């Protein structure tokens, strides 16, 4: 047989073998198209498990008349246009194969209208060459897709369909997964004319737990522990069930999403299972609903035609990040249950027609996500900023210079109890408790200060060391420990291990948590000032220092650590210097009254002024 180009219908049917596995696959592809179109309401009508009819109606932006024929063609899409787009996919669909593949194994009709059009248009493809016919129709703004007689022209595929109930259960599961991914969209599902599911959109700032309970059940909701974990461009949010109360029914709840895309990923499941293994039996599985947000450039979703899998560029980092996030929440084991909404669900009612939606290009707009209402917010992972509510709009420190300047001119609150009420002094008198005003940065690491007409130079690295020592020195309560994203495991000698065991209580007060075995020690947590340090260098040096000591005082250890920390700033900026001085004045007020050697040096300008006047 000679090499020849396959007819369009045959080529599409081959592609359909990868994309269209069963009716649930059709529903998934079409609903994802609706979400990409910016729909806020999606109605799904199913008949006979999807074998007879699948109808998807939405109020998205619609498709222009001139693009309807292209919409049913292979490799035609509005979601990517270049290789750069393919490397950072933010839409659910992007391959441009779904509609062409579905239309090749069914009788598909596409009806759509944009806000700019006065009338709707309907398109359908038929024949060996898949010629598209377009005609006018009546339809509100949005799109309706009807898929009739799925696999009517491929009897072998139709023969492999299961019972009507089984196929609809697969569709129901797909809708449950999509409803958990998009709390802001109303989704209605009906089967054989009867409404089966109604997931109402959660208003902005509303409680997502109501939909979570409707989908996953009250049992999961009562045992759910909220996760809010962040590290650089990685964010993990969602819920994981307490492993101590996991039942076989709960173990079936395993929903994971990567950048809003529902996913079954072995790497993610392994990380969660590993975090829960100490509390789960050999035959038990964790229950979770987790949302992983990652830089689109760091994940490849173009792996499987049905987009069930992804490939992470830094899979080990992602694995350890998820493991640490889940483990940290399980270690807290808060007992307060998630808030339940006892308001009864209204009885199902008839579904009205889709309302007219705005016809703007929703796909080009950034997705607005609502904050999760967590019961617990863990400490940020290594190199991360504190986890912020969704979305993260925390301003940078540069925008707060005015506030910092104001703090520099105020008297820090006295630590001792006042003996008697005294009249408040004017703000200008507070200069006696301040280093002064930062004029400029000299030689990249010194701040030129002015106070009461006097000029002085302050060594910023020395001020930073004093600040870190104050931050590391425990007060009435131990220093807060920050769990490491990846614990540091080191080999130690017998002498070093003995010293660590003797200093364990003092190190715990400093926020350093470790676990030792025969010849190794594993550092599991460190205080916040150490998070940006190279621990593979600092910790061995600290162990060597402890091995030479006979008395282990937290203050002495804090002083040694502060003097051996590497500075985070090779060159200081004005904003960084102002922030540092504000922190030093707040935590170390004694340094303002009695500056130690090497911190502050007065600058006498009188000789220079006199020389200028003499000339």
From Swiss-Prot:
Family: Belongs to the DNA mismatch repair MutL/HexB family.
InterPro entries the record matches: DNA_mismatch_repair_CS (IPR014762), DNA_mismatch_repair_MutL (IPR020667), DNA_mismatch_S5_2-like (IPR013507), HATPase_C_sf (IPR036890), MutL/Mlh/PMS (IPR002099), MutL/Mlh/Pms-like (IPR038973), MutL_C (IPR014790), MutL_C_dimsub (IPR042120)
Keywords from the UniProt entry: DNA damage, DNA repair
Identification of the protein by name: DNA mismatch repair protein MutL
UniProt biased composition (Low complexity): 378-391
GO biological process, one term: mismatch repair
CDD domains: HATPase_MutL-MLH-PMS-like, MutL_Trans_MutL
Start and end residues of each stretch annotated as Disordered: 370-397
Organismal lineage: Bacteria, Pseudomonadati, Pseudomonadota, Gammaproteobacteria, Enterobacterales
